[in-house]
Amino acid sequence: MTRLKNDTLLRALLRQPTEYTPVWLMRQAGRYLSEYNQTRARAGNFLALCKNPDFATEVTMQPLARFPLDAAILFSDILTIPDAMGLGLYFAEGEGPRFERPLREEWEIRALTVPDPAVHLRYVMDAVSQIRKTLDNRVPLIGFSGSPFTLACYMVEGAGGTDFRQIKTMLYRRPDLLHHILDINAQAVTAYLNAQIESGAQAVMIFDTWGGALSHAAYQQFSLRYMTQVLAGLRRYQGAERIPSIVFTKGGGLWLESIADSGCDAVGLDWTVNIGDARRRVGHKVALQGNLDPAVLFAEPGVIAAEVEQILASFGEGSGHIFNLGHGISQFTPPENALTLVEAVHSLSRRFHRADAEGNNSFGS
């Protein structure tokens, strides 16, 4: 296999020496870019954008044409799996994703089956293959999925941004039904991510967007348990290439030790966590990704650079840090501020990697 021209991200995920801190942005292909909006208009709607490999490739590549990012991430949606299960995904204008047939009845839940990614999600695999070819080994491609619990939230509630009344009622009244959904979802996520890896993804990420809405005990039982199941089933190698995995629970700072023990290679942090404290807690086990408040990108360039330096200094010297936002980039972000961020990370981080550059890595892999 041809070597990557820039494998800094993969080395950082495995806590191997790097010359600088790599950076990519959650939702880096998105509405803050005018070219994305133009492509979306040509596609007709968001789902058509996701389901057409040509469009998905085009928008995946757009931020890399603007910014010297260290990774591409597959352009898709976290709800492709429940859509493939037949729940009828659609997007209401101004309201986000919705399902025509949310899971409310026991017979519907018992009838759930694991979709075959090669059949029901072929368009995603075609996009992964096409993006890899288009990247031409420039930077690695990250594949992703929603976590079993986050998918279940949408599947039961029928929409996002709710008070979680439906799924929490099920959790406490009929935990057996929720466990059934989560087990099916975990099998589906495992198959989906493995298919992405086989199609060319060089790292994978699990987005646990709603895990932070749970109590401590419920998080362990209904979210982390099933992400651990997924991680245990993932391909760790594709040929001779190691495939790192990232887990991100928004609001999961209280559970870093548990997440670090799940089998992932890196833990994503939201902006409420001090990354230096996080490193002291789990940095001997996993790499850390994050964790700038996305709202910082509304500030002046000097403020952005200062906030970047604060996070870099908090993490400290050595490898094992992937710079990112603490959540997805806002659609209102000025693109030039994203460039300021990326350039600041690259320039300011080098002094924290001098020992790495000299071949000395105290943290190992």
From Swiss-Prot:
Its EC number is 4.1.1.37. SUPFAM superfamilies: UROD/MetE-like. It comes from the Bacteria. Keywords: Cytoplasm, Decarboxylase, Lyase, Porphyrin biosynthesis. It catalyses: uroporphyrinogen III + 4 H(+) = coproporphyrinogen III + 4 CO2. It is found in: Cytoplasm. Substrate binds at R27, Q28, A29, G30, R31, D77, Y154, T209, H327. One of its GO terms (cellular component) is cytosol. Pfam families: URO-D. Transmembrane segments: none annotated. InterPro entries: UROD/MetE-like_sf (IPR038071), Uroporphyrinogen_deCO2ase_HemE (IPR006361), Uroporphyrinogen_deCOase (IPR000257). The record marks D77 as: Transition state stabilizer. Its main location: cytoplasm. Pathway: Porphyrin-containing compound metabolism; protoporphyrin-IX biosynthesis; coproporphyrinogen-III from 5-aminolevulinate: step 4/4. GO terms for biological process: protoporphyrinogen IX biosynthetic process from glutamate. CDD domains: URO-D (cd00717). It is an enzyme of class 4 (lyase). Homodimer. Belongs to the uroporphyrinogen decarboxylase family. Catalyzes the decarboxylation of four acetate groups of uroporphyrinogen-III to yield coproporphyrinogen-III. This is Uroporphyrinogen decarboxylase. It comes from Nitrosospira multiformis (strain ATCC 25196 / NCIMB 11849 / C 71).
